[in-house]
Amino acid sequence: MLTATPLTTTGKSLFSQHYLETRLPAQPEWLEDPQPALDAALALWRKAQLYGANWNEAQTEDEFVKPLLAALGWSYIPQAKNSRSGRINRPDYALFADEASKDAAYPFQGNDDAFYTRALAIAEAKYWGRPLSRKDSSGRDTWKTDNNPSHQMVSYLVGTRRPWGILTNGQVWRLYSRDVSSTASEYYEFDLAGLLGARGAESGERTEAFKRFWLFFRRAAFTPDSQGRSFVQRIHEGSASYAREISDKLKELVFDEVMPEIAAGFVAYRRQQMGLREETAESLAEIYHASLSLLYKLLFVLYAEARSLLPVDNPAYWEESLTFVARQVAERIDRGLSLSEATHATRQYDSLLALFSRIDQGDPSLGVPRYDGGLFNPATPANQFLARHKLSDRAVARAVDILVRDAGQPVDYGYISVRNLGSIYEGLLENVLVVDAKPLGSTADASSMLPGVAQTPGVLNVALVNDKGERKATGSFYTPDFIVEYIVGQALDPILAQRAERFAAAMDQIAVLRRKLAHTLDAGANRVLREQLARAERDALEAFLGIKVCDPAMGSGHFLVNAVDHLTDGIIQRMQAYHDSHPDTPWAWNPIQRLLERVRQEILNEMGRQGIAVDPARLDDTALLTRLVMKRCIYGVDLNPLAVELAKLSLWLHSFTVGAPLSFLDHHLRWGNSLVGADVRTVERAISQTESGQLGLFGGP
């Protein structure tokens, strides 16, 4: 059946899958008939099945892409020349609303701004079935060889200033946007070959599935309406609105229900199983930190499973996955069944800890690599607490169900960004636990302020309050995205421009030295040239990867996550621009590209040693570069140790690379005072040492 295989995918969250499934059919465009375009696509597909495997790029365009663009209603001008040298280093197609717009643009070829302003979008085509997220050396490219198509799209969107771009190899079609945090990694992807080639599909099923392609890639999807908004813009805004709605709901639910439920479960366990009848301020702080750490882990796993960063397609892992557990819990709740086999049963909690351990240590039988430390490091105080304590099945089930469902529908963690998730949890950082509605050390009756406390029958009530004893979930200091993006852009764009000049100078020197080496036979001269080449390669690497960004009050890492995206896209665009303007300098001479290849091979080798099969396509250049940027360029400090852990979580999720360890951020994101540089006790100890004749903290004796 057609529905047995996934036909549409949301690459990295350009649109919400939940929005596409539940709200797209309510759009007026859904009622339109795609059958004429589907008939044209099927006719083209029949020819592609016979000959497509041997098509080069030009043949793919002539035999499939151009006719399909026409069937989708597009008017287009192919391969508009760049004014600088006449070299084709602009996208294959400028796409226009109609023939009149196309005719109006023709006279401006060579004037990029005037020409592309008249286009609705751009498009880039590759040979039939070519990988879209990595370089290819098969020789089937007729021009623009040795390029990463997704990186080309970043460069093209920046260069043409168009808001939308289409990238295709005939089989797979991607829609990119310039108005996102990371153009390189966020796109809507549709497996057109999977749809057209599906066997046994009923006509109605195929038509409805094709509609999800047709609605997003046809000309009408990009034409502004009377309010100046296009269909794709509306869906993008609707998806973003969905993410905000879910974030706001989760923020309230986490504060009112999930955290109190978890914390109350730990307090109950301590009373019932460990005989600890009273809690101190210190022990409540320990419970709070451990509860928040557990929440972080649940969030990490839900996010990673939703994006297939953990092997949910492996049947053995799937049966152990948190997503599978959540579905079982939802079914029991919906059927009114008991959430626990016994009052004090902890099977669900034990399974969670086992899953966390597998993520930390790896498990080849489940296809899980060893991620080695970070959030799942068993040596941390929070994780040691979690190992010594347990939660009942009921508490785990309730907490998980609240996190994964909204009004009975699954929460789309595949779309919610780490910035949305950061906003949920940042509001928890300044709170403390209260038990039985009385803050520790206070006689004030806070019951009137605690309508949503977690109640453990016959035992206790638990809630969160701020330092004023107020129960307030929204007291975070979260900066809106548009402000963050503006500040980050203003800070980094001038630096990237300067570093691009340094990179270009180093690459020019690399090209000269490599050509000299190719013709130098003298051993001494060869050695000198290689030393010079090594220095030039270090300069090229440091030009971009030597940029240092530090947030001295990082909170949840909002600014740092945006800085990672801005740097990654900026480096991609500027490297692509250099190679476009230097066609005789191959990408294989680029030290950053060579570093990406080396990192990819190191991960694959390590996975081989662990007995884990990893598709190399999962380790695409964009993901690896994002990780390199985070590993080499990003630093942060915060006074709140919980904020440090939240920032690590945000950046781990944002740079999650299959098979790569999580511990690499530990030395870059630190707990401390960015103004003083040390806590009071350290200063007092240093002063004492100075007075006794020992070396002081800030200078010599």
Model regions and ranges:
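Flexible phosphate/Mg2+-sensing switch loops adjacent to catalytic phosphate-binding sites
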Residues: 77-83, 183-188, 314-322, 500-545, ...
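Metal-dependent nuclease catalytic cores in nucleic-acid-processing enzymes
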Residues: 66-67, 147-166, 535, 614-620, ...
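Preference for the N-terminal adenyl/adenosyl cofactor-binding alpha/beta module
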Residues: 1-55, 125-127, 171, 181, ...
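Short glycine-/polar-rich loops that comprise or flank the Walker A/P-loop
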Residues: 118-119, 160-164, 170-171, 631-632, ...
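Carboxylate/His-rich catalytic cores and anion/metal-binding grooves
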Residues: 76, 85, 93, 99-107, ...
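A short, conserved, highly charged catalytic patch centered on acidic carboxylates
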Residues: 1-164, 178-185
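P-loop NTPase motor core
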Residues: 624-626, 630-635, 665-684
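Basic, amphipathic N-terminal segments
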Residues: 57, 61, 230, 234, ...
